[in-house]
Amino acid sequence: WMIEGEPSIDVWAMDVARFGDFATPGWGTIKSSENYERRFVMTFPNETLPKGRRQKTTALFDRFTSKGAVWDQGFGLENALWFAERPEDAHEDPTFHRSRAHKYVAREVKAVRENVGGIEIANYAKHEFKGPGSREFLNYILAGRLPRPGRINLTPMLTSKGKLYGDLTVACMEDEYFILFGSGLMQEAHRRWFEKRLPEKGVSYANRSDDYHGVAISGPKSRELLKRITRDDVTSGSFRFRDIR
């Protein structure tokens, strides 16, 4: 790492960028205690641990909880995994076999496939770039072609040795104004990556992950839902795939 500028193996498990401002000394004490208590306890797939939770929640947390949400957390932020029919049933039973979540997730998949469904996107990272030279800078650090204003592209971000360091959705709001959506868990690592490569003048960068919230809607009736909640023309001819407003 010191000689070649990047590690030759995956060292994410030892990277301090795994933690953000949610990882206070008190939180570290609680989680360390929890892990020590479980040192001889079997860990199951999809199992979530209860201590040190609710560091960050969104405006929809209480409403989702009342609707039977089962929660996990990523980078300190609570995010809904699936919904039970009743709040008292909102829990997972750890197992190596098919879990009780299966029927609930199947119901959600069927709803999105045949109708419309939504999911919070607060746990996606949002990186904002503004100012003269923003397009040139992003063209330099990203491997894919940047979109035109009002459009979205998906592009990888590579290291100097061609290794994948990020898979980002790039939204061009204006010619020199971009928002990059990426992994919430990697937001601190990506912030570090961007800031080390920013030019001295022109381009301003900010991590807006905690500032922007939203809901993604999908399904064959998603445009019908959009028509009910906005005055804009959201027909396929006016609001195309990969458009952004």
Regions found by a protein language model. Give the residues of each.
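Glycine/proline-enriched, intrinsically flexible loops and inter-domain linkers
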Residues: 2-3, 7-245
